[in-house]
């Protein structure tokens, strides 16, 4: 049987979000906050003055599908959350440029019959690619290690 394995990338807790779907999810919201430099070269430049920001600016509110399509290098991780949760059209995403942020932050809130969960990750951006973080690469390393491991956590 063929199997497509989607790594969690910069995030953790995706297994818990996926498990929560077994009882039914009501909402999944993913807020992605990055320094303005991480949004350079994207549509965000036409939605706000990235260089002139003095306070956090939420420049996008929409579905995970829309976020990933419009900001593929920054919000592709929103699809991971969506696929683990409510799907790309029911998962809500907010994208924020924050001049005071030195990290790429992901805040995921989910509610449902299981209760609620709040997941927050603050990943140091890669020096050569501020849109991404080392956690993304480490996630892939762990996936490869798990393929040959007798104990997988």
Regions found by a protein language model. Name each.
Residues 4-5, 10-153:
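Active-site-lining helix/loop region of Rossmann-like oxidoreductase modules
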Residues 1:
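Conserved PLP-enzyme active-site core in the AAT-like
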């Amino acid at each position: 049987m063929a199997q497509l394995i989607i790594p969690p990338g910069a995030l953790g807790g995706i297994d818990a979000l996926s498990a929560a779907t077994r009882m039914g999810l009501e909402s999944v919201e993913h807020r992605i906050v990055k320094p303005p430099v991480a949004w350079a070269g994207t549509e965000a430049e036409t939605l706000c003055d990235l260089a002139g920001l003095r306070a956090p600016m939420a420049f996008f509110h929409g579905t995970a599908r829309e976020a990933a399509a419009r900001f593929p290098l920054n919000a592709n991780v929103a699809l991971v959350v969506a696929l683990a949760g409510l799907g790309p059209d029911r998962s809500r995403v907010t994208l924020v440029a924050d001049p005071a942020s030195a990290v790429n932050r992901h805040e995921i809130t989910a509610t449902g019959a299981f209760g609620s969960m709040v997941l927050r990750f603050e990943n140091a951006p890669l020096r050569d690619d501020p849109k991404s973080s080392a956690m993304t690469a480490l996630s892939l390393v762990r996936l490869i290690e798990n393929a040959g491991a007798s104990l997988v956590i």
